[in-house]
Amino acid sequence: MQELDLIIVGAGPVGLYAAFYAGMRGLSVAIIESAQVPGGQPQNLYPEKLIYDIAGLPAVTGADLTKNLLEQLAQISHRLFLGESVQKIEKEEGIFSVTTDKSTRRAKGVLLTTGAGLLKPRKLGIDNEETLANEGKISYFITSLKEFEGKNVAVFGGGDSALDWSLMLEKVAKNVHLVHRRTAFRGHEITVDRVMNSNVQVHTPYTFSNLIENELELKKIKSEESLNFSIDKILVNYGFLTNQVTLAENLEVSRNGRVKADSMMQSNIEGLYVAGDASDYPGKMPLMSVGFGEAVHAINAMTKKLEFDHPLRGGHSSSIF
């Protein structure tokens, strides 16, 4: 069985960039991803949504970000295994064995970039919700804006996703109604201002009451007042429930299910590192840009701490490519 320098678990943005950086430093690297396509949440949940907070990219869609990361990754030698679910990670005599539902691979180090784990959307909470979702009446994320062209759309939620999607939908939908159960939104102030100055119709503090064919009824919180209007589609942005899977015995996790990391992004198991939304430490910020830096930090720490049987390259790309 071939022994690698590094196995990365998770092919989201942080995992893809980590693989590139590891390869740039001269490590032999493989990435294992349970999904059939790489890219994580940006590719699989919101490929057409614009992302604004990545340095040097004023705005980029989830799909384009994935495309760029894969083009970057193509510059270095690597193996990418898709559609494989990691079952366990074991360490024996300083070497990790990573077992999936298809194979077992060995490496000197492991980097977990599994994001927030398996994601399950929070539901609207109505009786026939599953039927409406199967009919396409209710969605929890958007993979194609074309589905909403010329439609009357109601967006439920009060965070950044609900605000961002309302602005995106405004460009293609006939009407967009944003419904939030509170008077104040939880999103970034600048995004809230953009929504308030757009053609999005904001209804606060309202919640779902009833849906009969295309007639949506909202009920005002702590009031008998109601509101009715016609809709074709409902987008629910109440966030996601996560199901973090503990992949290694004795791996320390925080109360929110993320892997505890030290200042070098190493877990309590020597040689097992973590980066991105899968990690937790004091002052942690769950941002993609932060995850990129965490991955670099982890790999640099790994190159100093672990023993490799071949020389490594320096950390500046301008001296390599």
Curated annotation (Swiss-Prot):
Residue runs in coiled coils: none
Subunit structure: Homodimer.
Keyword Aminoacyl-tRNA synthetase: no
Keywords, in A-Z order: FAD, Flavoprotein, NADP, Oxidoreductase
HAMAP family found in the cross-reference section: FENR2
Key word Oxidoreductase present: yes
Cofactor: how and how many bound: Binds 1 FAD per subunit.
Species for this entry: Lactococcus lactis subsp. lactis (strain IL1403) (Streptococcus lactis)
Molecular function, one GO term: flavin adenine dinucleotide binding
Signal peptide segment: none
Record-given protein name: Ferredoxin--NADP reductase
EC number: 1.18.1.2
Residues holding FAD: E33, Q41, Y46, V86, L119, D277, S318
